[in-house]
From Swiss-Prot:
NCBIfam families: L31, PRK01678.1. Keywords: Ribonucleoprotein, Ribosomal protein. InterPro entries: Ribosomal_bL28/bL31-like_sf, Ribosomal_bL31, Ribosomal_bL31_B, Ribosomal_bL31_sf. Signal peptide: none annotated. Part of the 50S ribosomal subunit. This is Large ribosomal subunit protein bL31B. The lineage of its organism: Bacteria, Pseudomonadati, Bacteroidota, Bacteroidia, Bacteroidales. One of its GO terms (molecular function) is structural constituent of ribosome. It comes from the Bacteria.
Length: 84
């Protein structure tokens, strides 16, 4: 790697997929205050809503991901109309 062109905080970081609990180690400049112990070392933790281990394109399975209650909100507004 060339000197002086990479950010100073480029370091190993653990990413955790919150939809299935999968964790993996990579390098990143993401800033976070959370840490996790992974393979005997302590690393910064970045939480992901979806990753390649849970995304339908990579898994081949369709899955509903409701991160902000959008489906519940829709069903409370329009759910009764569909049943008629």
């Amino acid at each position: 790697m060339k000197k002086g062109i990479h950010p100073e905080n480029y370091r190993p970081v653990v990413f955790k997929d919150m939809s299935n609990g999968d964790v993996f180690l990579s390098r990143s400049t993401c800033s976070t205050k959370e840490t996790i112990e992974f393979e005997g070392e302590t690393y910064p933790l970045v939480k992901l809503e979806i990753s390649n281990t849970s995304h339908p394109f990579y898994t081949g399975k369709s899955k509903l991901v409701d991160t902000a209650g959008r489906v519940d909100k829709f069903m409370s507004r329009y759910g009764n109309r569909m049943k008629k």
